Amino acid sequence: MGHFLRGNLHGSRGYHVPPVSKLFDLPGALASLNADFWQQALSLTDVYEYMPNDRRNEWNNQIHEMKAPDFEENAVRATLTELLFSRQKFFSERVDGIFRSLSRSHVTNRPEGFSKRMILEYMFDQWGTCNYDRTGYVDDLRKVIAKFMGRDATGLNTTNKILKIARDRSGEWITIDGGALRVKAFQKGTIHLEIHPDMAWRLNDILAFLHPAAIPAEHRQKPRTKAKTFELHTNLLPFSVLSVLGDLQTERTEPEQRNRREEPRPPVTTNPYNRRFKGYSDENPAARAEAEKVLLSLGGVKMNINAFTWFEFDYDPATALEDIQLSGALPELKTHQFYPTTGELAAQLLDEADIREGETCLEPSAGMGGLADLMPKAQTTCVEISPLHCRVLEAKGHNVIEADFLAWAPVTDQRFDVVVMNPPFSEGRAVAHLNAAADLVKNGGRLAAILPAGSDRKNLLPGWDCSWSAPMEGMFAGTGVCVVRLMAYKPD
């Protein structure tokens, strides 16, 4: 019955309902049935993952308009076989389609191939909604670049979410996919794209395969000089994990009454800063397990009632989660030396620092606020190198400066009554950070720090009045680091 109605009402849009006799015309029902079967058949294979945007649009239009071929065995076998064996060919078609989609009205787009900056038009409609026929080209570009980077593009379905974030941040360059792409969206519906030079020449190399005489040789060679404005990262989260994170939902925090006869059902949480996974846990358990680690690393606390689980935060995680969607990665622990201060250790250090009302304070390696959360926000300046961690700190209400502390300290004219810090330890950075922080302490001020064990045997701050705690083990999960607490007073 549904196919009779869908097939014979299609196109009427409610303005004209055909006679009842027409509702049961067989051709309309068969057209609806054909479209439904073709949709299911294509979804059962991975050809949609490989199809370039133009082919996807063509198939989607045939199915939507119910003009798909008859769903007969010979036709289905022949069509699916051809599509499956064309997957390699689709790769070059995808690159060609991306190039042809570039705006011809902007001189930034060069006719001889892909350049560093490109412009695509009509990506959003007048209401700011993604134009899916056009955003598919950006999706194709991301999948091609993913292949260049050795990433599995299966599950890459976050492009429209990313473009929506870009539009919400109109006029701002945002970096995506580990630095492979930069995107700037505009309210009029246009986006500007910047491609990493290592990716642009590879795209041109494929384009030259299709159009040998059109692409000059210099555009098909790897750049000899390293790009100064691009930093390419390769330790990226799988797209399947990013997809799970992109689908996170917020659990209701108010009682719900489904009907008048039923008592209101209380919410499982009253914390508005909560997130839960969409769907069932067995859909992609590996991706969900990795996504769970991401939420925990952002400070989420896993809660449950029987089998139902969700995560609660003490800040709004929306912007931090958006940044992960964009960059495709978490900050590297090794690079940023991010080992968050435990509650016990932070409380001990802040108790010794004894911050008083009106004193100006500095946390020079703030991370996600392990120490700063215990310091008076109105009196405290946080410095943090990781953009993602800065988003978390801002969401918590901290005053944040996004900078490398060792680069910021020599140029700032700010001085502080109290510095509280847990600096990175590797490659002598603890001492470098300590010395830089000491220069920012006012005369008569004080500094409280967590440092590697053994630091107490060195005269790190000559002329200061220093006291040290006993060595402490097991204070940072997953490490064998032994630490000491330093309390140092600068002479007047």
Placement of each model-derived feature along the sequence:
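Class I S-adenosyl-L-methionine-dependent methyltransferase catalytic core
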Residues: 1-492
